[in-house]
């Protein structure tokens, strides 16, 4: 069990939610989405962390919108945090960003493509902030054990207790321009002794599927989210937007903001059943 962002995280507790637009498009959008998500999750009793990126460093095309940049993006996230009283998360992309980002946010996130970059992972963990490490699309779930150990060792060396690491499943490459979610990975990744998060929106992404940008199949977000909650997860990650068709990044796999309440309500009910009845796989070892 981990305590972060003011709440308990683990399989003995209700799932928490990381949600927000893929990228910070404007100050107004950040406040609109964070405010609405706070309202929805508050009514449902879902612990909530607001997420949005100041820079999308791995866009398919060099001409695609990347975000407002670190300085402006962190100002917006800091204001959301202070004025709406919600914890915030954003991703970091290189070691130089780690310290300034950690000074602002409540939780760091590392991109899937960078999960094997040892110095980078160690730098994030050494801040002693909670770090959500996304599993690369190219890794087997059991490979995350070594990634988690690197991070935990760095946290211990920095004077922490090593209990600040989360691991996140976001699908595995399945041929070209496609991902598949193996729900066994959620159980396997528990062997890291880290809370496991499921990214329900990037798992339906079609990477590079539109040539200069990625496609997605948002209609399958509820399917995979329900499956993950039925297996048992500590947290869910879902990107959302008021108008996904106009989103500047990852619109095809974003959940429409006006559908989030309905989706979360069904997931909360399923989570209660799953965690009340225990985890079936433990009976077959």
Curated annotation (Swiss-Prot):
Pathway: Carbohydrate biosynthesis; 3-deoxy-D-manno-octulosonate biosynthesis; 3-deoxy-D-manno-octulosonate from D-ribulose 5-phosphate: step 2/3; Bacterial outer membrane biogenesis; lipopolysaccharide biosynthesis. The keyword Transferase applies. It catalyses: D-arabinose 5-phosphate + phosphoenolpyruvate + H2O = 3-deoxy-alpha-D-manno-2-octulosonate-8-phosphate + phosphate. It is found in: Cytoplasm. Its main location: cytoplasm. Keywords: Cytoplasm, Lipopolysaccharide biosynthesis, Transferase. Its EC number is 2.5.1.55. It comes from the Bacteria. One of its GO terms (cellular component) is cytoplasm. It is an enzyme of class 2 (transferase). GO terms for biological process: keto-3-deoxy-D-manno-octulosonic acid biosynthetic process. Disulfide bonds: none annotated. One of its GO terms (molecular function) is 3-deoxy-8-phosphooctulonate synthase activity. The keyword Nucleotide-binding does not apply. PANTHER family: PHOSPHO-2-DEHYDRO-3-DEOXYHEPTONATE ALDOLASE (PTHR21057). Belongs to the KdsA family. This is 2-dehydro-3-deoxyphosphooctonate aldolase. The gene is kdsA.
